[in-house]
Amino acid sequence: MGKSDRKLTEENSIENGVKPGKLTEEEMDAIDNSSQSKIVAIASMAKRLGLGLGSDLSQVEYPSSFIAPFSTLNFFSNNFANHFNILLRANKIENEMDRLIEVFKYSTTIHKIPEDCMKVPLNAVIGETQSLNFQTPDLNSPNDLISDNYLITEQVSELPPNTATCIYNKKEGVKALFNHESKIVFQITNVKTPTTGRKYVRFDKFDEEYDIEFPVLHSRFMRGFVEYCGEGSIKSNKSKCFVSTNYIAKPLIGGNYHAYEAKVYNGIDSKPIYKISGQWDGESKITNLKTNETKPFFKNITTTTNFTPTILNTDSSVVWGKIIQSVAQGKPINLAREKSKIIENQKTLNWAPSQFFLNLEMGVWEPKLLND
């Protein structure tokens, strides 16, 4: 049976041992030059690749018209830093319940939605890095800026794809660490991107860490939008207080985009103390379930953080420079050929982690700089 005859069946799924095929350069060029709609093009690619329910798309090469002008490495990482000042404020809060709620507030700001659900980021290559420092407004004194905040990220594994990102202020003793191992799973009418790996926030002052569980990102290309769905949580290693969150899928008719409902527990009572609800990319409200008092919780405003990059020879902007420029300008490019050149060049670097080391005891990639 040829590629063109393959059907979208569960027999072609990754769980049953059949990995996606590969598009030829001629097939990619034909898709890029076609006048057909993106939906039709996706169906055509799925058939040629032999995709089935559950197929892993993490290493699939796409035509350039389906590529976004950035890498998976920095797709999420900058968003982790944009509201870092919420954590710096939480570091001043002595009450453990109030501090937990502030960490939850930060967690609602780090979700990233691509502008075009029909395009995917470039797969980061091993050793790719990004390094930034930035200032952020002091939420306790809005006219002042807090300096010495840093973001470092590195692609520490290619198969499976694993990105390590850390945002920290060493002076304040505040750190957010994300080990982001993900895969892209074909679901026939949508694509989901589940992630594994430890993600946590640490306050040295309290010797406390909060583990964060992410919901799953769904790209609903048939409906034209992307959303997070499923359960999330935040738990402390010292306090019994925790947050349980449900990220709600938008119904076919009615409902809101990016809705969620969270419940805050003190770890003693089986009933929640607070309920927080709204839209994570918009406005939320918090209700005290004992008094039924409801008040505004948070308005997630898009911020523009002025990052100052430290450009290494492994920086994303260097690694992908030619491809990103061509894609951003809408120019056709032989993606497979250009990426092969990049991979071969990366191999000559004799890569060893430059920004992170594997903490075997904790099973996470930790930043070297904080352990020097």
UniProtKB/Swiss-Prot annotation:
GO terms for MF: sterol binding
Organism whose genome encodes this protein: Dictyostelium discoideum
Stretches with biased composition (Basic and acidic residues): 1-10
Name by which UniProt lists this protein: Oxysterol-binding protein 3
Disulfides per UniProt: none
Pfam families: Oxysterol_BP (PF01237)
Annotated Gene Ontology cellular component terms: cytosol; membrane
Gene that this sequence comes from: osbC
Residue ranges of the region described as Disordered: 1-25
Family note: Belongs to the OSBP family.
InterPro entries: OSBP_sf, Oxysterol-bd
